[in-house]
Amino acid sequence: MVRWLKLFDHQYFGFWVLGLVLFAIQEIPYMVMPLFHLETNPIMNMVETSAALDVCEKVLGSLCIALMIFVVHEEAVLFSVAEGRERLFFAVAVGVLLLNFFGWGLYFGGNQSVFVMMLFIVVMPPLYYVAIGLWRRNVLLTAVGVVFLVVHFLHVYGNLKA
């Protein structure tokens, strides 16, 4: 992990390679989706109802990924769960990721209800970014992740209900 330029307070522009790995892990369901030959795939075939929300969602989601990889705390190391707070939020991030994977398992198994999609597939990825932000003391990621959660939820729910 490297720090190149101080942004503000204890936040630096840098590079955290595990951020890239954590992003890739969260994307595994999309990588394996073609192997399942789904009869229906509402997540990938939604009718777009709001161009503005679509753009906001894409910008915020991409920003979460960039912030996770390129913003690091002054005292951060490559990987640490030494403090109680770090252990808690790392455990939350792992739990959220596992719930997301559970939801994808339901989805791939044919349970494609709006409830399953919204709870496990839509809500969990932004919460994953928020938990990682809290774990890594990355205030920008945490804040953008919360906004992404709201926009992502409203956008996908509106599309699924169309």
Please give the residue ranges for each predicted region.
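Membrane-interface helix-boundary motifs at transmembrane edges
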Residues: 8-11, 74-85, 134-140
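Hydrophobic, membrane-inserted alpha-helices
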Residues: 99-100, 122-132, 148-152
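Membrane-helix boundary connector in multi-pass membrane proteins
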Residues: 105-116, 127-142
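Helix-adjacent hinge/juxtasegments
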Residues: 66-98
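Terminal transmembrane helical module of multi-pass membrane proteins
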Residues: 134-162
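Selected alpha-helical membrane-embedding segments in polytopic membrane proteins
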Residues: 6, 10-76
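Non-cytosolic membrane-interface motifs at loop->transmembrane helix junctions
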Residues: 45-51, 109-122
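Juxtamembrane "helix-exit" motif on the non-cytosolic side of transmembrane helices
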Residues: 35-40, 102-110, 156-162
